[in-house]
C-alpha cells in the first residue's frame, strides 16, 4: 500500500473519531517503545502513518490497541 487513507481504515473501526483516538494511542505507543525491527521505513514514516497502516492492514485490531493502552 503506497498511501494510507482514512477510507482504508474505516472498514476496521466504526467512526472517523474512533480512528483518530486509536491511531493516536498506537502512535504514542510506537514512539514510547521505539520502532520494531519488523516496521519498514522506520526513519521515513512518522509514527502516525505507521499506526494507520497497521490498522488498515489489520496488523493490529482496535481491541488490541485498547487492551495495550489499559495494560500500560
Curated annotation (Swiss-Prot):
**GO process annotations (BP):** DNA-templated transcription
Query: Could you confirm whether the keyword Coiled coil appears in this record?
Result: no
Provide the GO MF annotations for this entry: DNA binding; DNA-directed RNA polymerase activity
Report if keyword Nucleotidyltransferase is assigned: yes
GO terms under cellular component: DNA-directed RNA polymerase complex
The EC designation for this entry is 2.7.7.6
Keywords, A to Z, come to: DNA-directed RNA polymerase, Nucleotidyltransferase, Transcription, Transferase
- Function according to Swiss-Prot or TrEMBL: Promotes RNA polymerase assembly. Latches the N- and C-terminal regions of the beta' subunit thereby facilitating its interaction with the beta and alpha subunits.
Q: Which NCBIfam families match?
A: rpoZ (TIGR00690)
List the protein's name: DNA-directed RNA polymerase subunit omega
Gene name of the encoded protein = rpoZ
